[in-house]
Every structure is written in C-alpha cells, then in structure tokens.
Swiss-Prot record:
It comes from the Bacteria. HAMAP family: AcetylCoA_CT_beta (MF_01395). Residues 45-307 form the CoA carboxyltransferase N-terminal domain. One of its GO terms (biological process) is malonyl-CoA biosynthetic process. This is Acetyl-coenzyme A carboxylase carboxyl transferase subunit beta. The gene is accD. Pathway: Lipid metabolism; malonyl-CoA biosynthesis; malonyl-CoA from acetyl-CoA: step 1/1. Residues 7-21 have a biased composition (Basic and acidic residues). Residues 1-26 are annotated as: Disordered. Pfam families: Carboxyl_trans. Its EC number is 2.1.3.15. Belongs to the AccD/PCCB family. Component of the acetyl coenzyme A carboxylase (ACC) complex. Biotin carboxylase (BC) catalyzes the carboxylation of biotin on its carrier protein (BCCP) and then the CO(2) group is transferred by the transcarboxylase to acetyl-CoA to form malonyl-CoA. InterPro entries: AcCoA_carboxyl_beta (IPR034733), Acetyl_CoA_COase_Trfase_b_su (IPR000438), ClpP/crotonase-like_dom_sf (IPR029045), COA_CT_N (IPR011762).
Length: 307
C-alpha cells in the first residue's frame, strides 16, 4: 500500500491558511471596510431655511445670492455684498480708521475686549463696517456695508469712523455713496461714545448733500435702534430688501409698551413702503441694476446743475 507523501507543516493546506486569516477575505476586507466607513461631512454643507425648515445646499444658496426658495433674504457679510453689487465683482477695499478700544473698560459678564476678539475671529472683519470702491452699473461709487454678524452690526466708535471714512472717500473722489444698513442699534459697551456717532454720521451726510453727491441707503434685515434714528433714514433714496425689519424699537417692545397687538407685517419693508417710509422694495438680484440706474440718473442731474 502506497504511503501518502508527508505535508510540509510550515506551509499547511490552503483551507487552514484561509482559516488563519491569510486568504482572499483578508485581502478584500480593507476595501470593504473603507466602502462602509463613515465619511466626514463639512458642517456648513447645508443651511436650514428659517421659514420652511428645508435644508438647502450652501452652494445653491450662494448661487442664489443667499435668497431661499421661499424668498427669505438671509443676512450676508460685506464680501458677498461687494461681489454682487460691484460690476463683475471688482472693487477696491478701503481701510477703516483705527480707534481706541474699550475706553470704558466695560464688562457685562464678559470683557468687551474679549467680545471684540471673538467677533473678529468669527467674521474676519476688524469691526461692523466695511468699505469698497468701484463701479455700480458703470458709475463710480463708494459702498459701505454694515455686518450684522459683528456684534449685531452695532454702531460704535469704529463703525462711526468707518461711515465717516466712506463719506470722505466719496467726497474726495466726487462720487455717490451707497450704504447697506444692518444693525440692532448703538453699541452699549461704549455708552455715550457710541451715541455720539449718530450725530457724527449725520454731519458726514450733510457734507455729501452740500457737495450735491447722492447718498442712497439700502435697508436690510434688521435695521433698528440708533442706526434707524440717524444715517439709515437720511438718504436721498431708500431701498429695502423684501421682509426686512426696519424701525427704532422692536415690535415686541412696542406691544409691551402700548399693550396692543400690532398689525400684520408691522415694521417690515413692504408695510413701510405703503406708509411712505421706504421708496421701494427691491429683490436682492435686482439691486445692482436698480442702483446703477439710480446713480446714473442722479449723477446726470448733478452735472446739469453744475453746467
């Protein structure tokens, strides 16, 4: 009887090797695990519509100028404003003057200086005002944008200096000025120094008027408090984005004070157009064309007066 050839114990048989984890399964396992592994998703990939709760791709919102399918004009920062307002998105960023920070050494549980640091980190802006210079509808213009993301767009010394710097730039270049407003009011951390900016910005607007240079205001959501009581309502023409809250005190404060229910849409831009406080409600995508047309007409009238 023939004897079976002894098997090399080092090699073993194929099945034994596979059972020990050296077969085909071990070769494909990494790929299988990779296919089903949890993938990292960017946190800001989606944005929730505040009206409908719908989740919207951030890229789609950016393409729509941050207007939701439901028509909500969402709050946006200076860079986005500049890019769609200026012709071909081309503009020169103008500096805002530095100011003394935290002169009152204010703290409301958190030091004011710490709040400034946090706001700058979140927005990438030195304060609530940003200035750009370029062409709007073919007309040279200085554009000022108030950033609500920076401490509620509040009006403080830096914001006041920013507004005055924009007005000076318009005067030096003899061009019109556009202001996009968005604020909760004066910056409480600066006390009376903040309230002073209401008078200072008003004087800057008077200089524009004395030079017969157009000053156009675009009221965005929200524009309230001391900003409404000063430069936001001193324009030659007032445009407003749809649904923007515009007023001095907020509706809840008013209701609590007068103890009456306010009418629907009270203090919204559409309501204010009906009452004559705003000249026109303009969709964000139409703003560049409308602004360009207004500036062209106003500057043409200025040239005729000069002649």
């Amino acid at each position: 009887m023939a004897m079976a050839e002894p098997q090399d114990p080092k090699k073993g048989d194929k099945k034994t090797a596979e059972r020990r984890g050296g077969g085909w399964l071990s070769r494909i396992a990494p790929g299988v695990r990779g296919a089903f592994a949890k993938r990292e998703t960017p946190e800001n990939l989606w944005v929730k519509c505040p009206d409908t709760g719908e989740m919207i791709f951030r890229s789609d919102l950016e393409a729509a100028l941050w207007v939701t399918p439901a028509g909500r004009h969402m709050r946006i920062g200076p860079e986005a404003r500049f890019k769609f307002t200026f012709d071909d998105g081309q503009y020169e960023a103008l500096p805002t003057p530095p100011v003394v920070e935290d002169p009152l050494k204010f703290s409301d549980g958190k030091p004011y200086k710490d709040r400034l640091v946090a706001a700058r980190k979140a927005t990438g802006e030195p304060d609530a005002m940003a200035i750009g210079y370029g062409k709007v509808g073919g007309v040279d213009a200085v554009v000022l944008v108030q950033d609500f993301a920076f401490m509620g767009g509040s009006l403080g010394m830096a914001a006041g200096e920013g507004f005055i710097a924009a007005a000076k730039a318009a005067l030096e270049r003899q061009v019109p000025m556009i202001a996009f407003t968005a604020a909760g009011g004066a910056r409480m951390q600066e006390g009376a120094l903040s309230l002073m900016q209401m008078a200072r910005t008003t004087l800057a607007i008077n200089e524009l008027k004395d030079a017969a240079l157009p000053y156009v205001v675009v009221l965005t959501d929200p524009t309230t408090g001391g900003v409404t009581a000063s430069y936001a309502m001193l324009g030659d023409i007032h445009l407003a984005e749809p649904g923007a809250l515009i007023g001095f005190a907020g509706p809840r404060v008013i209701e609590q004070t007068i103890r009456e229910t306010l009418p629907p849409g009270f203090q919204r831009s559409e309501y204010l157009v009906e009452k004559g406080m705003v000249d026109r409600v303009t969709h964000r995508k139409e703003l560049p064309e409308v602004l360009g047309s207004l500036l062209g007409t106003l500057m043409m009238g200025r040239k005729r007066q000069a002649a």
